[in-house]
């Protein structure tokens, strides 16, 4: 406990966010059932709710069903960010994506490029582009484009966001602010000051997303420019990397105890994936199955210090039960 408390008192650092599954305008589960669903029987919402407070006792023939019930019931009521807040937060924490432009060389065909980016204060992606790059020439001829971001590129069930918009050159009066925003995410990008480089802003038209592909909780939706820009970036998500790294390295058993106490699911392992002001997400395992669980905080976290306080409180509650 002492080392856990001491860690959270260290200086803060800003880190890249590690994204989560969401459903448009609803609080639906982020559980990954890529393997679990094949074993667990489909259940009604009513039967799931009846077992939300039950603990699983293994050795019985219906243990798989009990686990599915507990996961489903827990995930449906777990506190989480609204979908548009989640998307705004994930985009703000991301640093690279797939840019799609209209090819000038191969007319009528799309052209894809991996690009680094940073979001400005309004959530618009900023690109540092070279006049020599093919995608720059494409954008100058036709500004319509899209930017695809994966919260975790290695998780095919995870959140995918596509921002459609028009790429425009940043005006002279905005150069300093945009340069600062870009270098804050890419501090080693010294080439942005080269003569052939300039900044372009993708002005959003619509933001689409899909999550939970190949799981029991497939979801998709879209938000207008106004909805997207009105959403706020979660202030706690920036601390995800230092907190999760420390917890996974030094306190995995503590995380597992918290998950078991909150969900009643006797997970065999639990790795913290990310966090926000309302809670954190874990990748858990149980009897050969791997799935995601949402672990809500008892209340909204106010700052980095409060995250420490909440996790310690949750651990103390788990150890007292």
Swiss-Prot record:
PANTHER family hit by this protein: CREG1 PROTEIN, OS07G0573800 PROTEIN
UniProt EC number: 1.14.-.-
Function as written in the Swiss-Prot or TrEMBL entry: Dimeric beta-barrel protein binding to heme and catalyzing its degradation to produce biliverdin. May function in the tetrapyrrole biosynthetic pathway.
Record has Transferase as a keyword: no
Entry binding sites for heme b: 130, 134-135
Enzyme class at the top of the EC tree: oxidoreductase
Transit peptide endpoints, chain numbering: 1-45
Region (Dimerization): 96-116, 144-166, 205-208
Native species: Arabidopsis thaliana (Mouse-ear cress)
Keywords: Chloroplast, Heme, Iron, Metal-binding, Oxidoreductase, Plastid, Transit peptide
GO cellular component: chloroplast
UniProt main location, coarse: plastid
Quaternary structure and partners: Homodimer. Binds to heme in the interdimer interface; the heme iron is coordinated by a fixed water molecule.
Keyword Iron attached: yes
Location(s) in or outside the cell: Plastid, Chloroplast
Pfam family, one: DUF2470
GO annotation terms (biological process): heme catabolic process; tetrapyrrole biosynthetic process
Gene3D superfamilies according to UniProt: Electron Transport, Fmn-binding Protein, Chain A, PNP-oxidase-like
GO molecular function: heme binding; metal ion binding; oxidoreductase activity; protein homodimerization activity
Protein name: Non-canonical heme oxygenase HOZ, chloroplastic
Entry-linked InterPro entries: DUF2470, Haem_oxidase_HugZ-like_sf, Pyridox_Oxase_N, Split_barrel_FMN-bd
